[in-house]
Regions:
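Short, solvent-exposed turn/loop segments enriched in Gly/Ser/Thr/Pro and often Arg
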Residues: 9, 35, 192, 239-240
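Short polybasic/polar patches that bind polyanions
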Residues: 23, 205, 228
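Short, hydrophobic secondary-structure boundary micro-motifs
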Residues: 83-88, 110-111, 185-187, 213, ...
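GST-like domain detector, emphasizing the conserved glutathione-binding G-site
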Residues: 1-141, 179-181, 253
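Long, positively charged, glycine-interspersed low-complexity recognition regions
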Residues: 213-258
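GST-like fold's C-terminal all-alpha helical module
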Residues: 108-224
């Protein structure tokens, strides 16, 4: 068995966080790609690794570590080289963790709403109601989310609320970068907070919500900087973006641009 074994899904935003840290650290890892719509994450062998039935899960020397935020910090703890992704002072570390908590509670769940409505809904609409309910009930951490969406998608008020939360997060991000002096959230050094928000911003751009930072130059510069990081390209290999997997999304984005 390799030292690092990553169970994940290419388009999963939480998986993308962990892939980025592994790549930034230069750590060799074996990737096991799970088909979430086929229910790979609910197989008994995977549930032994991650009882929550979600991705990602990292197995390090045979021991599982779950939850993307926990995995990221674990990797930085055991491999601080070539450069630590956490502030060196207790106060800086506390501020980074507070920011990561905000990211996990506000924009990360919010971006799932337009993602599901725009990309994943046709898959659920092809199911019977009983099949859909059974699927929702099988996902301990996503049950309420899926049931609130239903097979008809999230209603307009839910979409509006999600977009408002994303706009609020982008505004706060712009302000934090300005206050820190940039180019990153915590100032001069890339941190786990940047990597935590990265998949949200990349997803927003992918599903044509990038106008949220048209008047936020700090966020635009931040996105250019993280795209230029050596870990970005191997993290976002082909098939990691929704527009690369779902042709109807790519067509929609092209029409919007035209």
């Amino acid at each position: 068995m390799p030292e690092f074994l990553l169970y994940n899904a290419p388009q999963s935003t939480c998986s993308q966080r962990v892939r980025f840290v592994l790549n930034a650290k230069g750590l060799a890892f074996e990737e096991v790609k799970l088909d979430l719509f086929a229910g790979d994450q609910l197989r008994p062998d995977y549930l032994k690794i991650n009882p929550n039935g979600v991705v990602p899960a990292l197995v390090h020397d045979g021991e599982p570590v779950i939850d993307s935020a926990v995995i990221m910090e674990y990797l930085d703890e055991i491999r601080p080289e070539p450069e630590s992704l956490r502030p060196k002072t207790p106060l800086g570390l506390a501020r980074m963790r507070s920011l990561m908590r905000f990211i996990d509670e506000v924009p990360t769940p919010a971006v799932r709403v337009p993602s599901y409505n725009l990309a994943f809904l046709p898959h659920f609409q092809a199911m019977s109601e009983d099949e859909f309910v059974a699927l929702a009930n099988s996902k301990p951490l996503r049950r309420e989310f899926l049931l609130s969406m239903g097979r008809s998608g999230f209603p307009e008020p839910d979409m509006k609320s999600a977009l408002d939360r994303l706009a609020r997060a982008v505004k706060r991000m712009d302000e934090i970068i300005a206050a820190s002096g940039g180019p990153w959230l915590m100032g001069e050094s890339l941190s786990l907070a940047d990597i935590a928000i990265m998949p949200v911003i990349v997803r927003m751009e992918d599903i044509d919500l990038g106008a949220a930072w048209d008047d936020k130059p700090n966020v635009a510069r931040w996105l250019s900087a993280i795209r230029a990081h050596p870990a970005f390209r191997p993290t976002y290999y082909f098939g990691s973006l929704l527009t690369e997997k779902y042709p109807h999304l790519a067509e929609r984005k092209s029409k919007q641009a035209g």
